[in-house]
């Protein structure tokens, strides 16, 4: 496992409304951000991107916004990758697996999920100590539950909490409260 470095390069996978809002929040906070979506029209939406670019220019931000046409391109040099795909087990497993294969070993995986066990998702990667889930609104500052599997690396957990703090959230780290269903299913077979 590569040593932890500061989380400065962020990949956002999913450029729907929430993904774009979160990406803009990251750039405003000074992060180098790459945004990717499976639907290129979301990235190239003239009105949406013009608004984002005008906002960024008007605020003279220190962060940078890059657009990627593939997940591989988006996560190539990411310190942290966060997805905004539907909160369904199959979708999350697919995107976690894809990012896990394509991103450098140091990359932290993060996902907003109100229902899925991060322990399950982490167990399907080669980096279970670097996987986290957030619960709460990512569009307005406030309290966020930062869920981690029992195997989480404390230094990485601290870095992820600091990242969300820089975005004006109040992360509350806690161990995954959800029963890992995938592991239960495997044990029962």
Spans of model-derived segments:
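Structural/interface elements that position substrates and couple domains in central-metabolism enzymes
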Residues: 34, 50-52, 151, 170-173, ...
